[in-house]
């Protein structure tokens, strides 16, 4: 199916084989979804008798789409991953596991997925949901993820490698905010390695939801041979659900999987893709036009006039409160996996060291609790990392701040804030390492 709204929308609808020719009576047209694969979906509670036909284009009926989207019940089960894998708190053991030869099954399949998008689109949250546990730091502030990290999801004979990338930003912003070079280069490197690209868009952000950034389009254009899917995130936070139809049309430029989509009820016309620019980009292999990014900046500039990408293979819509939507995307990834040797042993959950996991977890709490630039200026240092005689992992972290005012902010009145940060970070680390953790965070002014 070319447009995959989400499992929540379709789970109570009838589904027919693509070999059937289906249609419904014209007076019930608002009750079903027509897609390019040649099947129709309608609500059996309302329509009892129908005739059928095939339709060559993807048409989304606004009535049934909004009805199912608004009535979908929230699912709170977080068990998306069946394996209770943990990250080893011992650096040597974690490194040894990463170096261990994969335990290849007989019919091994694999898929490497790069998750890209603008800062704060929800990339790390989605990665955590797919893995079935919280592993990567998330916060409401931008640039929570500072460098690429790998999450590994292994089930039966299939391994999905998730590349969680920093939010795409510009060189000007990186220089202005003194951001690490990894925020600029890691997303592009990830796409070169990927078998599939997931472009994540936060539809609750009215400033960015209707247009893909130049950086996202540039990533896609430089890797036209890598299949890409569009994921609209946080759809439950969008009050006017009818806007989802317009957003889909704008971000795909009216094309999904090589076919035009028609959306009933869309209030804005879909801008046609600039054929010249896209054809030049697709001729990359023949002309070698994009092998050297610097030499072909003029062609990439043509992307600035675009708001969408007409080469998405599929479209998903995710709710932050309904995990069935994530489960649908997860199943899609497993189906898309190809016969290929595994890259990691089945016990590997991430390529991060336990120290990096700890630093990122604490940093998440600092970002959540401190204002403006304060958490971005802090550095961490490990003082103690050892297992005590009672089997508890003792971790002592020294937090360095640049100003005395920042120190007062971190400590909080009566030490309440640093105590809360310590407790929350410690609880998260216990869930990641699957062992008791005794965390101690102290604050010091860097001179």
Curated annotation (Swiss-Prot):
Residues 1-18 form a transit peptide. Residues 117-124 are annotated as: G1. It comes from Danio rerio. It comes from the Eukaryota. Residues 370-447 form the KH type-2 domain. The lineage of its organism: Eukaryota, Metazoa, Chordata, Craniata, Vertebrata. Pfam families: KH_2, MMR_HSR1. Residues 143-147 are annotated as: G2. GO terms for biological process: ribosomal small subunit assembly. Residues 109-340 form the Era-type G domain. This is GTPase Era, mitochondrial.
């Amino acid at each position: 199916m070319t447009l995959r709204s989400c499992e929540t929308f379709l789970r109570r609808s009838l589904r027919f084989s693509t070999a059937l020719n289906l249609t419904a009576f014209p007076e019930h047209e608002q009750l079903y979804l027509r897609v390019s694969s040649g099947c129709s979906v309608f609500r059996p509670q309302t329509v009892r008798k129908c005739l059928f036909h095939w339709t060559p284009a993807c048409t989304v009926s606004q009535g049934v789409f909004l009805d199912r989207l608004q009535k979908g019940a929230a699912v709170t089960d977080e068990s998306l991953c069946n394996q209770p894998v943990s990250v080893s708190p011992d650096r040597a053991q974690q490194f040894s596991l990463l170096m261990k030869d994969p335990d290849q099954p007989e019919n091994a399949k694999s898929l490497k997925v790069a998750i890209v998008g603008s800062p704060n689109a929800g990339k790390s949250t989605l990665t955590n949901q797919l893995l079935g546990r919280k592993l990567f730091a998330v916060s409401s502030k931008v640039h929570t993820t500072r460098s690429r990290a790998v999450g590994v999801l292994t089930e039966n004979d299939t391994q999905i490698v998730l590349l969680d990338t920093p939010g795409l930003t510009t060189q000007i912003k990186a220089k202005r905010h003194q951001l690490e070079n990894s925020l600029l280069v890691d997303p592009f490197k990830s796409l070169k390695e990927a078998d599939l690209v997931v472009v994540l868009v936060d539809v609750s952000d009215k400033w960015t939801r209707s247009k893909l950034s130049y950086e996202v389009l540039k990533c896609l254009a430089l890797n036209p041979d890598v299949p890409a899917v569009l994921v609209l995130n946080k759809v439950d936070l969008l009050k006017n659900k009818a806007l989802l139809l317009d957003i889909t049309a704008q971000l795909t430029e009216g094309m999904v999987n090589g076919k035009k989509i028609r959306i009933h009820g869309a209030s804005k016309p879909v801008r046609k893709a600039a054929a010249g620019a896209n054809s030049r980009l697709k001729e990359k292999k023949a002309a070698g036009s994009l092998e050297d990014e610097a030499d072909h900046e003029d062609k990439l500039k043509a992307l600035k006039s675009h708001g969408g990408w007409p080469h998405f293979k599929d479209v998903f819509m995710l709710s932050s409160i309904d995990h069935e939507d994530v489960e649908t995307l997860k199943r899609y990834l497993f189906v898309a996996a190809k016969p290929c040797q595994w890259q990691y042993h089945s016990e590997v959950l991430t390529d991060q060291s336990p120290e990096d996991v700890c630093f990122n977890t604490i940093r998440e709490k600092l970002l959540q609790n401190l204002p403006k630039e304060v958490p971005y200026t802090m550095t961490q240092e490990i003082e103690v990392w050892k297992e005590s005689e009672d089997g508890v992992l003792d971790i002592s972290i020294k937090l360095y701040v640049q100003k005395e005012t920042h120190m007062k902010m971190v400590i909080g009145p009566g030490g309440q804030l640093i105590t809360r940060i310590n407790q929350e970070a410690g609880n998260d680390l216990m869930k990641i390492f699957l062992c008791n953790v005794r965390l101690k965070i102290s604050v010091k002014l860097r001179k």
